[in-house]
């Protein structure tokens, strides 16, 4: 099995190694096995390292995009090309270089998660039952419900721990020593067990590289939380990711403050005032629209079917259709503006609307339903075509030809 240099030194960025195996994974991928590596393989909820191998100063870099491990092999996945097959013969000496920016960020996230999980377990007895670390997000699942106050308290304690700059120690205890150690573990582990300890905070079984001291994490922020399978899922960001997220949100908050002429610490109150003002204006607008539609309905000439389109939706559609239905022998149909038209159809004189619904579904793909002389739903289509179809149905007593 490949010697795992990342187990010994998580800060090792470059190393020398020798090719001991080359495998065709599929048509596009080769698996390179070396005698030693600093590349961390995917595992423990964390994506693998990336980087490159170098044969010499002339040969182009061989990019490593993924690293996988099983009970027998640790393979670095590279492009299955003729050049790489020639360059990676058994015995070839390579110089490896990992993507340090990704590695260090991953270590910040993972070490921060250990502190978080240790504190949650100590305070509330909840277990970490799920962890996912990728370039897009970091999630931690606990088997108990954390309140907003709980999360704020935990976040504060995590950052206090980070700023104490405690040493993080990783080692493989003997089977005898292991019997006397209490540690966290999400699953049973076959083979040698590696423990990661943060003094007085957490001891957890873990295969991944970690920062050397908690101070290197910098900062942990819980950016989202939700109930999940009877417990709690937290989204966290640490270190550079936390700083970038905070900077982006601060920038957006600044823009909002400028638009609303509000201080950055008062944007919520400013938005709340704007929302209340908008709600009042919307309420007044609906009232005005309702009055105008009532006046409009008085000018409509009675017909077999009245089919109209208005720039409104919701209760206004129904209210206007109800007014028009008094003047329609068959029914009144009112549609909203736009391509995705909402509609309400009302019959007050016994005209059956089931055939109307059937025709709208088959001709225009409408999604609709109703009862008691009322049909409502939505469809996509040209209003003129819909109106012509409905007028034909009304004239023919319920069927369109």
Model-derived features: positions:
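A glycine- and charged-residue-rich anion-binding loop/surface
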Residues: 1-401
């Amino acid at each position: 099995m490949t010697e795992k240099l990342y187990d010994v030194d998580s800060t090792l960025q470059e190393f020398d190694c020798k090719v001991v195996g080359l495998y065709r994974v599929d048509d596009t991928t080769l698996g390179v096995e070396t005698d030693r590596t600093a590349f961390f393989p995917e595992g423990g909820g964390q994506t693998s390292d990336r980087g490159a191998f170098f044969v010499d100063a002339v040969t182009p870099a061989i990019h490593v995009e993924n690293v996988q491990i099983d009970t027998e092999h640790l393979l670095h996945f590279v492009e299955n090309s003729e050049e790489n097959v020639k360059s990676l013969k058994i015995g070839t000496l390579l110089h490896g270089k990992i993507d340090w920016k990704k590695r260090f960020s991953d270590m910040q996230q993972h070490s921060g998660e250990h502190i978080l999980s240790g504190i949650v377990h100590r305070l509330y007895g909840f277990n970490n039952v799920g962890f996912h670390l990728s370039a897009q997000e970091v999630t931690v699942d606990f088997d108990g419900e954390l309140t907003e106050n709980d999360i704020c308290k935990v976040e504060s304690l995590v950052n206090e721990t980070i700023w104490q700059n405690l040493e993080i120690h990783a080692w493989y205890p003997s089977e005898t020593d292991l019997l006397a150690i209490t540690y966290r573990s999400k699953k049973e582990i076959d083979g040698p067990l590696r423990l990661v300890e943060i003094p007085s905070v957490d001891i957890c079984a873990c295969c991944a590289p970690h920062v050397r001291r908690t101070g290197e994490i910098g900062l942990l922020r819980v950016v989202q939380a939700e109930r999940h399978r009877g417990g709690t899922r937290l989204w966290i960001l640490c270190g550079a990711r936390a700083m970038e997220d905070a900077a982006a949100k601060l920038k957006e908050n600044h823009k909002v403050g400028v638009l609303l002429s509000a201080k950055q610490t008062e944007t919520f109150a400013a938005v709340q005032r704007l929302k209340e003002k908008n709600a009042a204006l919307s309420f007044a607008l609906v009232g005005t629209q309702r009055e105008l539609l009532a006046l409009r309905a008085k000018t409509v000439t009675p017909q077999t079917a009245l089919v109209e389109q208005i720039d409104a939706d919701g209760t206004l559609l129904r209210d206007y259709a109800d007014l028009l239905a008094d003047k329609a022998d068959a029914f009144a149909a009112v549609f909203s503006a736009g391509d995705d038209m909402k509609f309400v159809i009302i019959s007050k004189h016994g005209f059956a609307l089931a055939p109307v619904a059937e025709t709208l579904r088959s001709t225009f793909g409408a999604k609709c339903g109703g009862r008691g002389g009322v049909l409502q739903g939505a469809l996509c289509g040209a209003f003129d075509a819909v109106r012509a179809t409905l007028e034909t149905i009304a004239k023919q007593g319920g069927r369109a030809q």
